[in-house]
Structures are given as structure tokens and as C-alpha cells.
Amino acid sequence: YALALIGCDDYRSTTPPWLLYNFPKIENVIKFLCNTPCADGCDYCRNALDVHKGLKKIFGFDNFRTYNGEPLQEMAARAAVEGKSLLAVFPTGGGKSITFQLPALMAGKATHGLTVVISPLQSLMKDQVDNLAEKGIEDAVTVNGMLNPIERADALDRVASGKASILYISPEQLRSKTIERLLMSRNIVRFVIDEAHCFSAWGQDFRVDYLYIGDFIRKLQKEKKTDKKPIPVSCFTATA
């Protein structure tokens, strides 16, 4: 089953929910086969796992930004492509969005996976989805209270059908059974917490669902019955 999905020409094809239910470890098999570098000279590794080639192909940039001589963008993007969890602190306007969007779009093509981005502001989610669309990238959607019923249904359908590789939601959306069922039906490759300082700034007595994020990820992992290896998490902030 894993080889059949990997060999599909349409990267938007998804693993059927019945297959995920009956063979939950198929997600790990796909991730292992598609994300494990093999030997030097491998065409697949050069094209699917190289962050520089991904940056050029997807966004049209030749190089990542550096800060005080440090390649922070590249380091964060590479760590995500390698399947690691990470915390990254970037200066305001420092281009942190591309460091999680790039690995998410690469994973969407390589493993047919979905990256869930948890963001505090509806306007911020819309801006990021719109900015990607302006670049011709239609792989991102948002589900939030600004959508009318038709727009919400379309967004949910795009995620369920595999047309979306990035889903932007607020932490409150994790309480929704619709969202929970939706995420159960997809191969979740990573959770991204944007503006991660909200954990401590807000999570105690304002927007307490920030404190629910960890519980939800553990619950999802348990219900998916994949293995003991946790779903990777990336935390990004401009405020440490």
C-alpha cells in the first residue's frame, strides 16, 4: 500500500481513511521511505530532500537569509525536513514563515502529508494563505470563524481530498470534532506553533486552549496507533 501511494504521480493523492485505520503504521513506513537519505548521487534525495532546491523550485529564491552570519532560516528548514522537533526565535519580519512553509510543501509532495499550523490570529492565517496563493501556491487553507459555511466546507474538502498540504487553524479549533476527524483521516507530518510565546503569555488565563495543544497532539498520536515516536513539533516566535 505504501509503495502504491508513493508511486502515484499525483502528490495530492491521500491514504484512504480505511487504510489508515486498519494499517496505522503505514504513515511511518511512508515517512521512512520518503524522508531517509540514502547514498550520494541519489536523484530522489537531491530533488525531494534538498532544502536549497526546494527553496528555488517552490519560492524562486536562490539562498536563505542569514542573521549575524548565522544561517538560521536554513537550519530551521533543514531540521524540519529531517523530521526533528525544534524551537526557533527569529527577529520580527525575519522570514520565519518560509522556514515552516517550505518543509510543509516539500513533505506534501514527498509523503502526501499534512502540516498543521496553529496560529493565534485569523487575519494572520488569511494573510499567509493569500500570500502563498499570490505566488501560485494553492496548497494552503485556513479554517476559522471568518469563513462562511460554503467557504468552510470547501476548505475542509480540500484538506480531506489531499489538495492542501498546510492547514492553518487556531488552538480553539482543536476542540472541534470535525477538525479531529479531519486530522485523523490525513497523514500528519508536523504541528507548527506560530507565535509560540502565546503559551506563556496567554495560555494561563486567556485563550487557555493553548495549554490544550500538547494534550491534543498526544491524543491524536494515541488514536492513530502509529508508534511511540511523537509527531514532530516546530515552535516559532519573534519574542523569547
Which residues fall in each region the model found?
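Short, intrinsically disordered, charge-balanced linker/junction segments flanking boundaries
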Residues: 1, 56-59, 156, 236-240
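N-terminal accessory nucleic-acid engagement/regulatory domains that precede
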Residues: 1-46
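Conserved pre-motif I regulatory segment
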Residues: 41-91
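Pre-Walker A (Motif I) flank of P-loop NTPase domains
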Residues: 82-88, 113-115, 163-165, 229-232
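Conserved SF1/SF2 helicase motif Ia
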Residues: 89-94, 99-140, 144, 221-229
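Conserved helix/coil segment N-terminal to the catalytic DExD/H
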Residues: 105, 147-190, 198-204
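A short beta-strand-to-loop transition that corresponds to the Sensor-1 phosphate-sensing loop
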Residues: 121-122, 169-173, 195-196, 236-240
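Post-DEXD/H (motif II) to motif III coupling segment of the RecA-like Helicase ATP-binding lobe
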Residues: 184-185, 189-190, 197-240
